């Protein structure tokens, strides 16, 4: 039996990892360029059979539709007959990593011209990049390749564009993006939600409810509020003989590694009054032969929340320190080049290794995720299992952030029908020595630049340098942006279906496509892939719905003391916490979240409201075994109590099944699909496009103020 090397991957695996598949050398019915992709890791699942059936039905439906299209266009195609015993010579594939790297397109896009020569609709899609700033080069390049008309200075005719690409979340987004049919690449409030402390609050709430599911995040303390808790943890660890514990201090507003330092005692914190995060340091990272610490930047895409759809990019980045790692001690803990993987920090070190070619990056300070997966695989690491676990981290982290994403969307587009928001996210993951992935941070605006600065000979980077092409960034970011645009415009299936060719009659273009064998750079991981595995974590949206009934969404996203008192009265919880005691409890919770004992009229954020719910649930349902069961009982109790006011929290989320292909879609804000906010002329609207927004104001049921 012969052995062929395949770099093709199914959409659930990182690009470029190497797999072997045995093919008989004389078996002309199975050309070597059609080798079966590597199979992704599967753990025993209970309810995934339904999702597999859905996927199969969807595949069969697409194939039938494709056959119809090919049949209709067959008389217009230039055909090339290929006899079974005269198959075209396949692309040469070598088992060496170098040959694979050499055969890959340097830009991350197919070598063939991909500029669309035809429209997929009655008009061409448009994109506004006037606020893209540093993202503009890559976005413009991808737009051109896809055939999107770009407006780098905005449209002079004041007509809306199909896509708006911004480099940051703009406070006046609702004034810039006025059409519900448009797509914009940022969710309102996402910058704040992804900050270190806000992210920690989101994950901490889920850890209380699902401790085993959220063990991938290090122990964390928010200062100054949690200083006493941090001291208590440290004393307990010392009593248990853990004398070599180290912690990492991160300013909440910090970025690119600024202001970060290591400590091994609470007494070493430089400013206990500063708003900052202290995390347990991962002192046992997985290392390779070069003994350099590294982490992964994995890219996720939230396609929409209506319906909810989360994707992962098959290719990511591995970022390496520039000095060899040793466990921190009093002699080396200040050497950040050995402890922090941040590119912005390490690029200033003379030991930083830039990569001019894909072959160079196998030893560079910035490498492809797939390259490192191959290197780890050769050392016996089970990379399929690792990739499976990393994707679950992306899903679980996004679900933890989801309630507040919904809240900020409703607040920002309170008086308007909002557009479809989508967002590329960067998830920083480190691997422990035992192969366990740990989430470090989430970046709401990961860099999409595809170049870097190389210092002039004999000078340091601080003295300036020359901006040159970054081959690693190109291979990662160009397909990422390109496929994200295809995804939100509904062009993904059309583009990649052309690679699944049947029959013996192929056009010349089809033969070129066979050689390229491109696969989608993005694959859906929720709800399609991991819906059965993680669907139970989609839980706190009911709490968010109740929360929004008592918040003045037009002007605020926090709940005031008056709102909490109204919640206690209308949910019949006065026997648990009398209204006169609410203010004292609010002060206690507010200090835990802000470090201030007085609310100053700002109210409590959502996760502080959750702490209030947890407190009530613990007191009201003492016979339940765990907090999750108690909170479930409390939410059901509140739901029943609020029905007399015309409110049902169970209506927040709505799942719909497409009867044609059996695909399940979960709408997190179904009220935006139905009626206007005032409740007048409340009739169901037809969907107009993927925005899932009707041509009317969104509706969120309000509580009847009459008791």
From Swiss-Prot:
PROSITE patterns, A to Z: TTL
One MF annotation (Gene Ontology) recorded for this entry: protein-glutamic acid ligase activity, initiating
Comp. bias regions, Polar residues: 677-696
EC numbers on record: 6.-.-.-
Keyword ATP-binding in annotation: yes
Catalytic activity annotation: L-glutamyl-[protein] + L-glutamate + ATP = gamma-L-glutamyl-L-glutamyl-[protein] + ADP + phosphate + H(+)
Gene3D superfamilies assigned to the protein according to its UniProt record, in alphabetical order: ATP-grasp fold, B domain (3.30.470.20)
One GO location term (cellular component): ciliary basal body
InterPro entries from the UniProt entry: TTL/TTLL_fam (IPR004344)
Principal cellular location given in the protein's record: other
Compartments (UniProt record): Cell projection, Axon; Perikaryon; Cell projection, Dendrite; Cell projection, Cilium
Keywords recorded for this protein, A-Z: ATP-binding, Cell projection, Ligase, Nucleotide-binding
Region ranges (Disordered): 675-707
Main EC class the enzyme belongs to: ligase
Residues that, per the record, bind ATP: 279-282, 293, 295
Keyword Nucleus: no
Superkingdom in the source lineage: Eukaryota
TTL domain boundaries: 124-488
Record-linked Pfam families: TTL (PF03133)
Record family assignment: Belongs to the tubulin--tyrosine ligase family.
PANTHER family: TUBULIN POLYGLUTAMYLASE, TUBULIN POLYGLUTAMYLASE TTLL11
Protein function: Polyglutamylase which preferentially modifies tubulin. Involved in the side-chain initiation step of the polyglutamylation reaction. By controlling tubulin glutamylation, regulates ciliary specialization and motor-based transport. Promotes the formation of A and B tubule singlets by splaying microtubule doublets in cilia. Together with ttll-4 and 5, required for male mating.
Name the UniProt record assigns to this protein: Tubulin polyglutamylase ttll-11
Species for this entry: Caenorhabditis elegans
Taxonomic classification: Eukaryota, Metazoa, Ecdysozoa, Nematoda, Chromadorea
Gene from which this protein is expressed: ttll-11
């Amino acid at each position: 039996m012969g052995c062929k090397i395949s770099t093709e991957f199914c959409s659930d695996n990182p690009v470029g990892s190497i797999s072997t598949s045995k093919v008989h050398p004389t078996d002309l019915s199975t050309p070597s360029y059609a080798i079966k992709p590597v199979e992704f890791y599967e753990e025993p699942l209970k309810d995934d059979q339904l999702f597999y059936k859905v996927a199969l039905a969807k595949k069969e439906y697409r194939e039938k539709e494709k056959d119809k299209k090919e049949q209709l266009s067959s008389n217009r195609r230039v055909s090339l007959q290929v006899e079974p015993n005269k198959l075209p010579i396949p692309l040469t594939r070598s088992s060496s990593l170098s040959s694979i790297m050499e055969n890959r397109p340097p830009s991350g896009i197919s070598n063939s011209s991909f500029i669309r020569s035809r429209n997929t609709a009655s008009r061409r899609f448009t994109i506004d990049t006037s606020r893209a700033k540093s993202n503009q080069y890559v976005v413009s390049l991808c737009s051109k390749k896809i055939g999107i008309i770009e407006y780098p200075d905005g449209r002079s005719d004041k007509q809306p564009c199909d896509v708006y690409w911004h480099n940051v979340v703009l406070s006046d987004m609702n004034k810039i993006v006025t059409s519900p049919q448009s797509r914009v690449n940022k969710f309102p409030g996402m910058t704040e939600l992804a900050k270190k402390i806000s992210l920690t609050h989101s994950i901490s709430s889920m850890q209380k409810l699902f401790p085993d599911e959220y063990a991938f995040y290090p122990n964390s303390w928010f200062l100054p509020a949690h200083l006493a808790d941090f001291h208590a943890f440290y004393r307990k660890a010392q009593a248990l003989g853990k004398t070599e514990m180290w912690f990492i201090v991160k300013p909440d507003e910090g970025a690119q590694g600024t202001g970060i330092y290591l400590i091994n005692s609470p007494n070493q914190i430089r400013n206990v009054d500063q708003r900052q995060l202290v995390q347990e340091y991962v002192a046992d990272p997985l290392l390779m032969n070069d003994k350099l610490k590294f982490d992964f930047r994995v890219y996720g895409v939230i396609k929409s929340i209506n319906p909810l759809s989360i994707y992962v990019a098959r290719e990511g980045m591995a970022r390496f320190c520039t000095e060899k790692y040793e466990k921190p001690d009093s002699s080396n803990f200040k050497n950040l080049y050995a402890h922090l993987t941040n590119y912005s920090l390490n690029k200033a070190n003379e030991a930083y290794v830039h990569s001019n070619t894909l072959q160079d990056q196998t030893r560079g300070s910035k490498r492809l995720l797939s390259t490192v997966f191959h290197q780890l695989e050769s050392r016996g690491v089970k990379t399929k299992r690792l990739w499976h676990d990393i994707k679950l981290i992306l899903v679980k982290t996004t679900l933890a952030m989801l309630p507040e994403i919904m809240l900020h969307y409703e607040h920002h587009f309170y008086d308007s029908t909002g557009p479809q928001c989508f967002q590329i996210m960067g998830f920083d993951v480190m691997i422990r020595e035992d192969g366990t992935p740990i989430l470090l941070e989430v970046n709401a605006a990961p860099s999409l630049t595809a170049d870097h600065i190389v210092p002039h000979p004999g000078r340091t980077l601080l003295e300036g340098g020359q901006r040159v092409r970054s081959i690693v960034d190109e291979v990662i970011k160009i397909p990422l942006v390109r496929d994200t645009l295809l995804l939100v415009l509904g062009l993904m299936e059309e583009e990649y279906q052309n690679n699944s060719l049947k029959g013996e009659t192929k056009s010349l273009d089809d033969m070129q496509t066979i050689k390229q064998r491109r696969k989608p750079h993005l694959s859906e991981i929720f709800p399609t892939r991991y819906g059965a595995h993680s669907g139970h974590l989609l839980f706190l949206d009911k709490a968010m719905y109740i929360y929004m009934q008592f918040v003045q969404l037009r002007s605020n996203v926090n709940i005031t003391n008056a709102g909490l008192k109204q919640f206690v009265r209308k949910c019949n919880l006065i026997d648990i916490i009398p209204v006169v005691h609410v203010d004292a409890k609010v002060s206690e919770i507010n200090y835990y979240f802000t470090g201030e004992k007085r609310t100053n009229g700002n109210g409590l954020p959502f996760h502080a409201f959750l702490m209030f719910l947890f407190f009530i649930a613990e007191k009201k349902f003492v016979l339940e075994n765990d907090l999750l069961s108690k909170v479930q009982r409390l939410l059901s109790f509140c739901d029943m109590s609020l029905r007399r006011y015309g409110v049902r929290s169970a209506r927040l989320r709505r799942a719909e099944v497409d009867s044609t292909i059996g695909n399940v879609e979960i709408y997190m804000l179904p009220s935006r699909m139905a009626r206007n906010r005032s409740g007048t002329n409340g009739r169901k609207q037809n969907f107009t496009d993927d925005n899932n927004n009707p041509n009317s104001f969104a509706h969120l049921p309000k509580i009847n103020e009459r008791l």
